[in-house]
Amino acid sequence: MDHEADAFRDLMTITRFVLNEQSKYPESRGDFTILLSNIVLGCKFVCSAVNKAGLAKLIGLAGDTNIQGEEQKKLDVLSNDVFVKALVSSGRTSVLVSEEDEEATFVESSKCGKYCVVFDPLDGSSNIDCGVSIGTIFGIYTMEHSDEPTTKDVLKPGNEMVAAGYCMYGSSCMLVLSTGTGVHGFTLDPSLGEFILTHPDIKIPKKGNIYSVNEGNAQNWDGPTTKYVERCKYPKDGSPAKSLRYVGSMVADVHRTLLYGGIFLYPADKKSPNGKLRVLYEVFPMAFLMEQAGGQAFTGKKRALDLVPKKIHERSPIFLGSYDDVEEIKALYAEEEKN
């Protein structure tokens, strides 16, 4: 982009966007804006580390082959450290739940704030070596009391989240965010170092022609999932078959589903009867975004955002995407329940 030639354009950065949203609420003190700024900073840091990872491993930048190689292997740990520090230093968080940490992190009272953040610092990190898109997923809750924070402050249904999003590190770095009033996508301009609004008010198509699932697990699926995937491949109503697209990185698969429509499935199976994806920092944020974009998210039993987790690393099956596509698999589960 020629920034001098396009200087007249009204570039909406993510900070300006959130400040504009904040101005709609006169009682707002800017706490959420500060918190989000720190999340954005974490995303920029991780994006830079991910982009250098393969190069550092191959040629050893500045001769630090061993150190860089070690960092490459532990990029998910590095990402976790970055986000924990960014969130604590914001002074706006009280409880942090990360995919990398067995226990929740409770922020000391001198730096404590009113928000609880659940996150997966680097989802799909096993794909780093082959250059596949990976990402950070996050969800934000508000503490409704001034008592000592506990895990109960995050063990709440997803419909109580105040914001959710993900940052995808791929051919471009894109942050997709919802604060409960629609879904917006921001792309990182490397020359500016700013996330610019490039995808305002994202709406998922009502029906799609893509399904996304790991068919390697097909022999272990339940009846409704098996029937649904068969319908996708061999429709009996004369409609064209759906195309299979599966990256194996949740952020990449959900991002494509959000933009192009279709359905993402990660069902329970005989090996993982409770599902594989974690409720708090994978299922809930993605379900929140899908609903805000006009889609649906279903667990096989209920609306995903109505789940009430009992443990911070609890797992669940998930079916999310275009409204009509999810409606179809819901009907198959309802049919099985009747029988």
UniProtKB/Swiss-Prot annotation:
Keywords: Carbohydrate metabolism, Cytoplasm, Hydrolase, Magnesium, Metal-binding. The keyword Cell cycle does not apply. Binds 3 Mg(2+) ions per subunit. One of its GO terms (molecular function) is metal ion binding. Mg(2+) 3 binds at D120, D123, E282. It is found in: Cytoplasm. SUPFAM superfamilies: Carbohydrate phosphatase (SSF56655). Mg(2+) 1 binds at E70, E99. Its EC number is 3.1.3.11. It catalyses: beta-D-fructose 1,6-bisphosphate + H2O = beta-D-fructose 6-phosphate + phosphate. Gene3D superfamilies: 3.40.190.80, Fructose-1,6-Bisphosphatase, subunit A, domain 1. PANTHER family: FRUCTOSE-1,6-BISPHOSPHATASE, CYTOSOLIC, FRUCTOSE-1,6-BISPHOSPHATASE-RELATED. This is Fructose-1,6-bisphosphatase, cytosolic. It comes from Brassica napus.
